[in-house]
Amino acid sequence: MLTMENVTALRMRRHCLTRRAGAAEYDALYLDLSPGLNVHWHGFGQPPCLVERADFDDVEYNGRRQRQRILVKGRFQNGNIGFVEAAQMELFAGLYRRPYKPTEHSELLRELIGREGPLNIEAMKRMTGLLVKQITPALHRLQEAFLVFEDQFDGEWDRGWYLFDEMFPDVDPARISRTEALLRVLPRLAHRQVYLTAADAKDFYGLPARDVAAAMEELARQGILVRWRE
């Protein structure tokens, strides 16, 4: 029978904290803990990393994966920037896509990017007469709806913005529902955490508590997750 002491030991092992991961094991860990985040003390544009998990320089490794567009940028947990594998974009779009509420500025930029893109913010400013403080929130609104994509493949400031479906023609952001996406990602996180509460999962994914709790109940009903017994 598992005790909390056993849980802690197994969690540390599964998070590669007691023995650092090689590349294949690291890729699996990154997938299970996605979206990957920038460490808060890193400089602008630095790749995401999993601190103290890899037996190699994972900042350099993930930088290479960014340049190859294996890792791509989006706005996920509560609108925060994160990086996921491009092959997982449809799943995370289903998990995080927000309903699009158009504004005058967001529609102007969406049409402009569709006609002239890719464009950086400086070009948008020049072509529309809008200020950066007007452009940025409009782009974030479009980004959170998975209507535009910011191509941050290196640490430079001069990043191009594309229509989402131009960069991901085979991805339908509406194909996977949030419920279905949660049923896929929660077992990944539970495997790494060993013991996972709905509150923990809510905090990790930045999603409504009721959605997370309902998905965990369904996974328990299916026998994929097992309820903890004291």
Predicted segments with their positions:
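Long, low-complexity intrinsically disordered regions
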Residues: 1-230
